[in-house]
Amino acid sequence: MSAPRYKSGSAKKVYKKAPGNSSIVHYRRKKQSNAVCGACGALLNGVPRGRAVEITKLAKTQKRPERAFGGNLCPKCVKKMMVAKARNF
């Protein structure tokens, strides 16, 4: 019987062949989904993909791009927003 921690949806089953032609199940953590832009939903470049535990071990500069709204908006949406704010200013 599997342990309770493996019964949740966050554990991914991987079937392996063991010696003697027996099949065993390994459990792995699923990967986090890619970060997306808050405005248009496009995938964000420069933002790591991983669980929170793995990301907290990274340096601050490796967690998101060093530009305005880095890690939240894609460059196209940032440019559109800045142009719109400059025109309304």
From Swiss-Prot:
It holds the Pfam family Ribosomal_L34e. One of its GO terms (molecular function) is structural constituent of ribosome. Keywords: Ribonucleoprotein, Ribosomal protein. GO terms for cellular component: ribonucleoprotein complex; ribosome. Coiled coil: none annotated. One of its GO terms (biological process) is translation. Belongs to the eukaryotic ribosomal protein eL34 family. This is Large ribosomal subunit protein eL34. It comes from Methanococcus maripaludis (strain C6 / ATCC BAA-1332). The gene is rpl34e.
